[in-house]
């Protein structure tokens, strides 16, 4: 039996009919804050408001619903960093199917709990592997041994067709408002979302530039399509943007993206954190890191999109509140507002007061101070964190620190030491 490896607009139209009474038609909103900031019209497709707070329900339900009754009776499995799993268990509950969900050990607790919440007694969650790719290998082995049905999160034409319904829905909404998009920005993890969207847009909105956005620490599609012209596996990835941190994209999504995606943007994880905080404070939108990728990319395209009409897909809103401290920390470091030093501190009374008076600027703030006293020496080691009011103050701060201790270590520039702090 030949396995289908292409996706057509007909496939997406058929998926749209299957999903019509299952998924929520999420809003397409003109965002006034971003429109003013970038001097253009920025629309947001709010998939963070989907039933499982992610677009993944579309692909999961479509892929499961096309299984035969015999296949469904054997149960389903999936590997996911969170959102695809929620789509699968939501579907399993609706169709009363047995499901085993494999998730990386590093998955935020909030996403693990949400999977259990959306599922039922027929759903089992297995935490295994440090990355999605390790987790995937375990899931495939289990699926084969138990003769179940693996629901691929991206490298499956039915999953891709389901994600493509987002594009059909978006174009119908924009047509009713007489809106034509010049640019579309969407996140890339394994490539299912961008493959489905781009397939539909290239047929029904061919003048729209499709921009795929990846975290800089996991740009597997860019490395495969642009750099190597073949699917490659990244040896190491940054797992912070957990919903889009994939070391290897799908063979099917690679071919579709290669044909349809006009350009790729890699966004620093710190910039994503700044976007998350900005969206929350300015727009009251709770976006997860992968969900904020599309908006983060606008800064890279600010000269191109001026005066244009843009749409960003907010792909998910399953953010763990316990991560907010780390998100704020990464944002401050990226914006060059927080700086860490290792200093030799004189072991005598008044040394700290001298440091505060002589080194800190009038608006600087100490956010971390760890002191290791050494009884047999004249100085002790201090790790200190300083937050600035203006990142332009850094040059003068470093000059004053160097005067206080010429042998100091600036931790922000030391990748290994820096990684220990965040």
From Swiss-Prot:
InterPro entries referenced in this protein's UniProt entry, alphabetically: ACT-like_dom_sf, IlvA, Ser/Thr_Dehydratase, Ser/Thr_deHydtase_PyrdxlP-BS, TD_ACT-like, TD_ACT-like_sf, TrpB-like_PALP, TrpB-like_PALP_sf
UniProt: pyridoxal 5'-phosphate binding residues: 83, 189-193, 315
Domain of life: Bacteria
Protein EC: 4.3.1.19
Necessary cofactors: pyridoxal 5'-phosphate
Entry GO MF terms: L-serine ammonia-lyase activity; pyridoxal phosphate binding; threonine deaminase activity
Keyword line: Amino-acid biosynthesis, Branched-chain amino acid biosynthesis, Isoleucine biosynthesis, Lyase, Pyridoxal phosphate
BP GO terms, sorted: isoleucine biosynthetic process; L-serine catabolic process; threonine catabolic process; threonine metabolic process
Catalytic activity: L-threonine = 2-oxobutanoate + NH4(+)
Family: Belongs to the serine/threonine dehydratase family.
Binding partners and assembly: Homotetramer.
Protein name: L-threonine dehydratase biosynthetic IlvA
């Amino acid at each position: 039996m030949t396995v289908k490896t292409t996706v057509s607009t007909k496939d997406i139209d058929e998926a749209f009919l299957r999903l019509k009474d299952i998924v929520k038609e999420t809003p397409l909103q003109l965002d006034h804050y971003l429109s003013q900031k970038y001097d253009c019209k920025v629309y947001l497709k709010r998939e963070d408001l989907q039933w499982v707070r992610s677009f993944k329900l579309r692909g999961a339900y479509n892929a499961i619903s096309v299984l035969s009754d015999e296949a469904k009776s054997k149960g389903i499995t999936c590997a996911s960093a969170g959102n695809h799993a929620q789509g699968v268990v939501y579907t399993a509950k609706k169709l009363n199917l047995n499901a085993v969900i494999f998730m990386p050990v590093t998955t935020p607790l909030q996403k693990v709990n949400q999977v259990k919440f959306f599922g039922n007694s027929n759903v089992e969650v297995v935490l295994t592997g440090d990355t999605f790719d390790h987790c995937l290998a375990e899931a495939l082995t289990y699926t084969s041994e138990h003769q179940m049905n693996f629901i691929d999160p991206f490298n499956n034409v039915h999953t891709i067709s389901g994600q493509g319904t987002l594009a059909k829905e978006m174009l119908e909404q924009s047509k009713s408002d007489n809106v034509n998009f010049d640019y579309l920005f969407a996140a890339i993890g394994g490539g299912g979302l961008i493959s489905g969207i781009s397939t539909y847009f290239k047929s029904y909105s061919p003048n729209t530039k499709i921009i795929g956005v990846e975290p800089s620490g996991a740009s597997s599609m860019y490395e495969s399509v642009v750099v190597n012209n073949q699917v490659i596996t990244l040896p190491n990835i940054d797992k912070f943007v957990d919903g889009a941190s994939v070391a290897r994209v799908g063979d099917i999504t690679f071919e579709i993206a290669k044909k349809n995606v006009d350009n790729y943007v890699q966004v620093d994880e710190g910039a994503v954190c700044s976007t998350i905080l900005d969206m929350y404070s300015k727009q009251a939108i709770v976006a997860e890191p992968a969900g904020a990728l599309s908006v983060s990319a606008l800064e890279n395209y600010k000269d191109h999109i001026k005066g244009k009409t843009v749409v960003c897909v907010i792909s998910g809103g399953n953010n763990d509140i316990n991560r907010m401290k780390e998100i704020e920390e990464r944002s401050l470091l990226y914006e060059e507002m927080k700086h860490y030093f290792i200093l030799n501190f004189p072991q005598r009374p008044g040394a700290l007061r001298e440091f505060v008076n002589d080194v800190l600027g009038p608006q600087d703030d100490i956010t971390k101070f760890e002191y290791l006293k050494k009884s047999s020496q004249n100085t002790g080691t201090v790790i200190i964190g300083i937050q600035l009011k203006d990142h332009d103050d850094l040059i003068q701060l470093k000059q004053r620190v160097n005067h206080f201790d010429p042998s100091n270590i600036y931790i922000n520039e030391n990748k290994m030491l820096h990684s220990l702090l965040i």
